[in-house]
């Protein structure tokens, strides 16, 4: 791999603004002229007050919405292309789960979407899912569902992990296990971007903090 390619940012956000309901009498400016670069192996925390645009920025990097102006590249590609190739994994605050199947069935169903994936035993251990495998998703607590989302994010062995309030609903023990696992993932060279309202978590885990306001 060339030195130039190694130094290219994994995530490159250039002059991005996002306005919701732009054509209405009351448009909402979620982000204004945001630029940032995140490099391979970095652990970066996105902090800001409610409404600062943290989740909107994560959604943009994931290609779930498009910027009103500016550009975003992930691993040198459009967010949509990077997601489609399985190079990005994400843990979101809510949604994305089928309530009427078990945790194990969820892993198997999503695993089938990848040409190849990490071993289920590895995912189960790293996401601490062993005690809830046979439980229906609808019967899982909020913290248990977050653990499942984390496992699903790791399935495709992604190069980038985006974590939007990943420990929401987790008890102290589950949060500790989660961050220990995240450190191991970062040590393996994965790039990690997280939002959290737990300032102590961000200061402890992130190598760099970016404030949005």
Protein language model regions, located:
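Walker A (P-loop) phosphate-binding loop of ABC-type ATPase nucleotide-binding domains
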Residues: 49-53
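Helix-to-loop junction immediately C-terminal to a conserved catalytic motif
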Residues: 62
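Conserved catalytic motifs of ABC-family nucleotide-binding domains
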Residues: 157
